[in-house]
Structures are given as C-alpha cells and as structure tokens.
C-alpha cells in the first residue's frame, strides 16, 4: 500500500471552497429566524445538487460508459429501500388517520428517501476524489468546532446565535450548559463533530504533512467534549485506532509528529476534560455547568433515562406500524429517544427489521469493497459507531452520518474516467 496514498490526489483551492460550504450546510442544517422549513440550508443544498445532477450528470449516470459498478448498484439499492419505507409509511399513515396523536413518521421517511437515498447519488458527482471530500469535511468540522468553542466561552457569541438562528434542542442557546453550534446542538452536534474526526484521521495517516490535521483533530475533539459525551467518547476510541494505524502504516515523520504534538495536546485536553466533569467552581466559565447540577439535569444517567421512557408492547399495531415515532395510538404509547424503538413504533417491527438489516448489510458490503486498507478500517469503525449510536438516538434519520459514510465509500474507488471537470 502506498504510504502517502492521498498526496497524489488533487484538491484545487477554488473548488475546495464551495465544496466546504456544500458539506457544511448539508451536515449542519442552518435555519435563520423567519426562514421557512423548506428553505433551510440542507434543503437548499439538496435542491442545487438535484438540479445539477438532472441537468448535467443524469445522462452520464445512465450511459454504458459509466463503469463505477459499485456506486451505481448501491445508489439504486439505497433508492429502492427508501421508496419501500416511504410507500409503506404512506399506507400506514392513511390507515391510522385520526386514530392517534404524536410526532408523525411520514415526514422522516420522505426526507430519508430524498436526503439519503437521492442526495448520496447526487453528491458523488461533486467530488473528483476522496481527498476533496475528506478536506471539505475536515474544514467544515473545524469551522463548526470554532463556533462551538466560541459559543461556550463567549456570552456575546451565544446571544448572537440565540437572536439569529433556530436550533433543534431541549434547551435554548442561553439556557444550556453545553456548547452549541450553528444549526445543531446536543448529542446530534456531538455525533456530527465525530463524523468530521473520521476524515481527519484518514488525512493524518494518508498525507505526508499531517501536523495541521493533528492540531485540527485536537480542536474538534475539544469541541466535542464541550458539546456532549457521545461524540467525545467515540472520538477517543477513534484516536486510539488512528494511533495504532499510524504506527503500523505511517512514516517516521508521521509517528514523530503524532507522538510529540499528540502527547502535549491530549494532555491538555484530558486535563480540561477532568475539570469539565468535576465540581470545581473556580475554573472560569465552567461554572455554567453547576447551574444545571443544582436542578439535577447534569447528573442524569442516559441509560436510566432510556429505561424510564415508555415503549409500546408488540401487537398488531406495532408489528405493522402506527405512523408515529413518538406518541399514542389506540392506548399504545412510545416516548423513547432510541432510534431503533422509534422506528419500531412508527414503521412497525417487521419493516424496521428489514430496513436496518438491509441498510447495515449495504454499508458492510461497501466497506468490504474499499481497496485501501486504512480507509476500509476507519470507515468500518464509522459503520460500527453508526450501529451503536442509533441505539441512543435516531441519527440515521438526521441524514448526516449516512451521507458521510456512503459518499466516502463511493469516492474511495472512483474511477479516473469519471472525474468531473
């Protein structure tokens, strides 16, 4: 395997700039106050990508000369499973019309079809190689990390975000002990930051000059610490894996830079982590955490909370689906935050098993198809993280993780003749 397998891939600066915005405004759904839901940043990016695909790349995708067989096969399967789930949910919604109340599943399945099944296909044509996508994800995540850190330590930044942008979170910008970002917050933001750590890890191993990416990894991981434990813990596990891969496949320069910078940087990081999870009142801005400890919010245990949430038993309704991912139908109630249980209540047990089995099988096949060993291992770790994280919250129906995973898999083996000029 080529030690610096990313050095020979080109990433022109002009193209990289709009690719960064393309990635940032899809992964993080930015919505200023007064802007309707149909015009959030994620949906605007989808409209642009869809229009460009139809007008420029549809003929190429359908032509006999298009020889990226894995991409074509996987994208069609993604669209197929998206259509099946959406059509089934449409039928269930019609059958249960007026019989229950809660948060409907129909919109989630429609957006999965559009923002995962179709958008992953559209996005393939916006990047010439895997390095362009990795760099776009890296810089987009660094930008978000800077915003998170500024939000945590600067009240002025927090007020600015509070006055100008909507956020999907349990608490507003001014009432949270955690750092918030632009267009995302809490555990979803933590997972999205982790999504940026995976491309950063690949860049650290695959580029001969990796010092900048090591600093970037530390900054993103620190932001994840301020946001939520899920992304931070996954980032630490990914760090351990990355260090192992560097010492197996990396050069002496890569090993030295990671050892020196990493030791100093992560010593500081873990020192801050120890303070962050402690009750030390004297440490500057961390006093904001204690306000939540006084009312017991900070000490809640995630596992205990999930156990206390109502889950409907298996019956005919939950076998076929109720059309609500959280709510009450014919006396059955589910209020769970777990992605698997929300799908079970909304789509039904049968379709949920089929959906996750088919999707995870497709993800596993795409990981095995990757030729580069380092990328294969790190995207395999991302796959396992997605499976694990879905047990906490419905991250798959927030679309960022499937977008990053599938697009990285597609671009890893993109044929040279399919490059876009």
Please annotate each region the language model reported.
Residues 76, 237, 241-249, 256, ...:
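Hydrophobic transmembrane alpha-helices and their immediate junctions
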Residues 1-64, 88-92, 386-388, 401-403:
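N-terminal signal-anchor transmembrane segment
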Residues 34-43, 102-108, 184-190, 213-249, ...:
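Helix-loop-helix junctions and helix-breaking kinks within/between transmembrane helices
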Residues 31, 38, 161, 283-347:
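Long extracytoplasmic/lumenal interhelical loops at the membrane interface
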Residues 244-294, 314-316:
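A membrane-periplasm/extracellular boundary helix in multi-pass inner-membrane enzymes
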Residues 77-90, 98-123, 132, 136, ...:
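Aromatic-anchored transmembrane helix interface
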Residues 198, 202, 240-241, 377-387, ...:
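Transmembrane alpha-helices of multi-pass inner-membrane enzymes
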Residues 134-159, 182-228, 232-246:
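Alpha-helical transmembrane segments of multi-pass inner-membrane proteins
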